């Protein structure tokens, strides 16, 4: 019996003690064996570090306590917004010998504890402006041995406590895009190792820190399309009346002289009024003794003078211009000599004569007949050195210069511009102490002549086949020349003071311009281009800082 009882096994109490002891052994073993942290196959990890080689993307499955990450020879080329935001405790980040070509805006967002960032030996040409946004704790930054050619302006602005910066081993192009860096290096408290220019040739191997700011010519200008007036026009004349800015446009296509008003709030030209004019070629506004008059010159149906009545707020016809004197007007010039107001009309009729009219008390009266029988096309009034002159041109003979005689109170023929016998139009400008004439030609090159007393010397020839309009104008100290054509786009030239000639500056898509008009409107500097075949375009002159 005793043997049978022995085969029944250990007592229940002994089994319970054995089970308890086994559990305690398991707990002790669990405490002795460290838990393996998560780690991607391309990385080697400890509890707070990760070293990754040949990764195909920024590793995601990393210990949350990681404070140091190294990426070497990564198989991806771009780092995008928030790429490391899953590692908020990161303090050290090394991106070395990778194939990175792009690091985008906010690439390191969420790394508010990052102190050391090394992006070295990659193939990055440039960085985004906000690449380093959010790195408020960064003290050491290395961008050494990349292929950086430029850096966005103020890229280091978010790095408030940056102590050390390394930019060595890059291919910096020291043009206007780097000017801001030269300025920043001169004032920053950050320690920056010497860096050198790779280009352009004149700065090659020069230390960036030593570049003189005066060597950077970074301010340029541009004419940008500002407003489109959806109608053709053949002349444009801005004028001020009662402290407001207006524009008079001759529009034979709609049988009117259209008056536009500048809206200083909307900063646009708005419709204001119209004067009936079935065949208008020029609408010339004149403000005489605070009264507004508009001379309406027409090819057919006679020419007239209108007066603005502020009481009825409308234009009323003041007088007719004798059709026997003015048959086919082509251009108008208004000017003041010794306190008296005049306007001259260029007559393109074979039987007509260019005529001068003078204001007297209540109207304009015929004052002088000039240059009869020559089919004149253009007038230019020049008031220089106290000697008022009027230049009359047409396409069949040399332009004629008339000088005002204060004794006779008339224009007297002074000479001709024989260098250009077929000028379609003549304009003038002054540069320094010298006076110049610009003469446009429909066939052949337009000419720039220096005016030297009674002599003229050619300065420049400008290709201009099909040109019926040119205009020199001055904007903020910069001198330009607009040269139009019926066969090609308008060319804008800029005056080169050193070379004393115009250089090609910009091309404007204007079809068949008939005039160019510079109009300052508050802080907007505008160039108007009335077109005979298309829309009338308004361009704005803007100043561009290439270092921005």
Swiss-Prot record:
GO cellular component: extracellular region; neuron projection; synaptic vesicle
Major localization listed first in the record, in broad terms: secreted
Cellular compartment(s): Secreted; Cytoplasmic vesicle, Secretory vesicle, Synaptic vesicle; Synapse, Synaptosome
Signal sequence region: 1-30
InterPro entries: Cys-rich_flank_reg_C, EAR, EPTP, Leu-rich_rpt, Leu-rich_rpt_typical-subtyp, LGI_related, LRR_dom_sf, Quinoprot_gluc/sorb_DH_b-prop
EAR repeats: 222-264, 268-310, 314-361, 363-406, 410-453, 455-497, 501-543
PANTHER family for the chain: LEUCINE-RICH REPEAT LGI FAMILY MEMBER 3, LEUCINE-RICH REPEAT-CONTAINING PROTEIN
Described function: May participate in the regulation of neuronal exocytosis.
Name this polypeptide is given: Leucine-rich repeat LGI family member 3
Organism: Macaca fascicularis (Crab-eating macaque)
